[in-house]
Amino acid sequence: MIPGALESNVTGSSNDGRVGTTVTAGASIHTTGSWSTLIASSSAVAAGVYIKVVGVGSSNVSSSMLMDIGTGTLGSETVLIPDLLVGYAGSDVSMGRTYFFPLAISSGTRISARCQSVISSDTAEVAIWLAQ
């Protein structure tokens, strides 16, 4: 648990190594996929966002990937954090890529992510924690 964390999309450990939410890149390289909901509705006001991305990359293959973190209702998302570098994030055993952003998030906010990659339909596992 992250100190001061209010809520997360992580539901505990998983036998298949997945954490958080799977986000899929577009079917064509360098195109964004659809928005995936990370948190449907934040339960309280938050002062920051921790983001951890894993599951991107395999040996001897380019796994460059960019991710947008957005807020807003389904179909009306607004990019909050653009082009976050998440490629080569490795497995959950490695630290993957972990970020903290000091952002004010209102109660009731939907938080989502989408990504684009040099590999069509590549995936990433995204964990998010809202901090007090």
Where are these regions (language model features)?
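Beta-strand-centric surfaces of beta-sandwich/beta-rich domains
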Residues: 1-132
